[in-house]
């Protein structure tokens, strides 16, 4: 991949792709002072939302809060462009509470473009990147390359479709569904990354020439329907119920514009019969493609086949913006031919006269299995080459944005010869996701879920700033104003918790009878407000209602103090588990350990541990292919060896923090 041409331009960091991962990566790198360029196929489709125009949801909102806590932008833009907000899982515990916002997709894209254009150190270029320029082995070490030997090459730049060369010390690939992208409507298909936009050529082949393995995945999006053709008055309305809730921790980003309602309809027997009669006409069920689609976002065909006992499925009608009649038919993606799609839509109550503005389609595309990456999202084969977003096999804007921030951060640190930042899975959903991606052989699009985290009570959305903003400050991503806001919030929360622990409600106080009636428990003499909060059904909002708390106190402060108090026992136990994991991570591994002789380890773990030879248990946990079960086996082996040896055996004692 050597060349005789001089670069057209030279940058520190080049980001390839202008989606949600690419934008976060480029902004992060530029804010850290690196001369950065963002290359995209279409500057008019920056941070586009080609599927659901929404941000957040279970686990996804936690990711958005975490990105914001680290200085990212997805939360700010979602707040600024939200047209409806709802709290999901409100009846359950705070570990699974989730904020979800419908956004104005065109306004979201416009605001992101403006943000990029006004970010210092950041240049925008509209071009198709088709090649990677490297220094080193052009085959990336070949098929027999051993990761323990280190990278086989170093990135030096990119080449575009029309032959221009751009130099770079680091490159972040965030190509989404555009690599080898092909969209399908029935058995008809065309090369495209998404409807109306060309696929990216050459980059898949460039990666394969460097020794990378690529595979195919599939996703899809439903039809868009003209709002004016729907009998909305016949359908159940779903209004906004959380206009005063925000993703960003920065009050300066809070915005509450005019809210819009969604509506709910359901599939009918006619819908199901149409699908059953025409399954063979889809690309998947017709055997034309076999790419794996997202398990947690199935097509309507998959729902009918997999849940044959259900006679109806809920469908949500969601507006795409304030200035467009387009309605997103959520839960109704399909790969059926266009004429049948219209029949399906008109089989839904309220949509009997529906006008279809855009047909549903499936898209299958090339992706880079993330086991070929380090936890920093840098590729193992090529130093300075990073990958983030849907290219890594994930699905969702939120997952992409989080990876983009991590890749942009570590690309900047690679150039500065600084240590990469690894996010442990016990500290954030970002860490949980990346740990899953780089260590598991995933065969379907990955979506973050609260069930994927062993520590979800600690990894809540409301405390993402407490968990990650100090790190963001240390890394240079949080400015002085944001840091002062964070410190002020912490002080206010601590003061409120102290007040709740000290102030008592006496049985003779005016509010006592109502409180006793609501909680169903008597007040014996007096009770601290903290103990009152610990009673089931009593919340900070109730204290305000009874005149026992300051209504002027910011909602995040009141609710944060409540959660800390109400769930203090559970939080303490989970924190002990996390601390134990951290202590175990500092355990030294003997240099002479024979992994092949530890029969309780999986075969893959024995091979990987022998090749990498980690110094600590924490480093072993970062090795792709070494599972949690393997780590437990290794820890048990260490304990057994310790009992068999002298108590003073220093090589088995806990040591300082592994880096």
Curated annotation (Swiss-Prot):
Pfam families noted in UniProt: GIDA (PF01134), GIDA_C_1st (PF21680), SAM_GIDA_C (PF13932)
Compartment(s): Cytoplasm
GO molecular function: flavin adenine dinucleotide binding
Cofactor annotation: FAD
Keyword Cytoplasm recorded: yes
Positions with a binding annotation for NAD(+): 293-307
Any single Gene Ontology cellular-component annotation: cytoplasm
Binding-site positions, FAD: 17-22
Annotated GO biological process: tRNA methylation; tRNA wobble uridine modification
Assigned keywords, A-Z: Cytoplasm, FAD, Flavoprotein, NAD, tRNA processing
Subunit structure: Homodimer. Heterotetramer of two MnmE and two MnmG subunits.
Family of the protein in this entry: Belongs to the MnmG family.
UniProt cross-references to PANTHER family, sorted A to Z: GLUCOSE INHIBITED DIVISION PROTEIN A, PROTEIN MTO1 HOMOLOG, MITOCHONDRIAL
Listed NCBIfam families: mnmG_gidA
Protein name: tRNA uridine 5-carboxymethylaminomethyl modification enzyme MnmG
Gene: mnmG
